[in-house]
């Protein structure tokens, strides 16, 4: 299975680029528009990694190129995000059960908040196979990460839940509650 990995900013993918280069396998770099896609083998798995820029439009552009040009089977978003769940801490991994647009509003046309016109629901259910793979991957590396952070207040955890995506930065209590 070939996996596409998207990071919005350089800090979210630079270690992945370095690991790919250090893997000892050939790395192909392909430029499409202003984007550079790095294709190779990471930990025995074929991957294509891209730093795509911030926002849903950039993520959609990268996703379409990864599917149409590189024929990836799955897409993973790597990087930081805001956290609406008070349990979340730095280094935690969030595995999506489903996703929703938090800034989509077609309610005037009779749709639910977050629902894209023409879809049956505002929620996009995550692929169970990919969720299971993410859980298994986390468990494989969690012990080593925890051991390296022994004595630290930051111990990574895996949390499953709904991911709300949008281009609106959530910085106030009213938006957060919505």
Where are these regions (language model features)?
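N-terminal short beta-loop-beta anion/metal-coordinating cradle
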Residues: 1-64, 70
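Short active-site-adjacent helix-start/loop capping segments
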Residues: 13-14, 56-59, 83-87, 103-104
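Solvent-exposed alpha-helices and their adjacent loops that cap or buttress functional pockets
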Residues: 40-43, 68-69, 86-87, 154-156
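Mid-sequence, gly/pro-rich, charge-dense loop/helix-turn segments that line enzyme active sites
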Residues: 84-178
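A glycine- and small-aliphatic-rich helix-loop capping segment at beta-alpha/alpha-beta transitions
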Residues: 19-26, 68, 89-100
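Hydrophobic alpha-helical elements and their junctions with loops/disorder across both membrane
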Residues: 66-67, 141
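Structural motif
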Residues: 73-74
């Amino acid at each position: 299975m070939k996996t596409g990995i998207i990071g919005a900013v350089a800090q979210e993918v630079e270690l992945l680029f370095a690991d790919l280069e250090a893997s000892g396998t050939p790395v192909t770099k392909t430029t499409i528009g202003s984007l550079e896609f790095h294709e190779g083998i990471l930990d025995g798995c074929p991957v294509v990694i891209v730093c795509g820029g911030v926002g849903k439009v950039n993520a959609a552009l990268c996703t379409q190129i990864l599917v149409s040009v590189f024929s990836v089977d799955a897409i993973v978003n790597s990087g930081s995000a805001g956290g609406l769940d008070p349990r979340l801490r730095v280094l935690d991994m969030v595995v999506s059960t489903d996703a929703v647009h938090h800034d989509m509003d077609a309610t005037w046309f009779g749709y639910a908040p977050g629902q894209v016109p023409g879809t049956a629901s505002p929620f996009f259910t995550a692929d169970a196979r990919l969720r299971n793979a993410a859980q298994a991957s986390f468990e494989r590396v969690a012990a080593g990460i925890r051991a390296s952070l022994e004595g630290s207040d930051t111990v990574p955890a895996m949390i499953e839940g709904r991911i709300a995506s949008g281009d609106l930065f959530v910085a106030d209590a009213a938006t957060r509650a919505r």
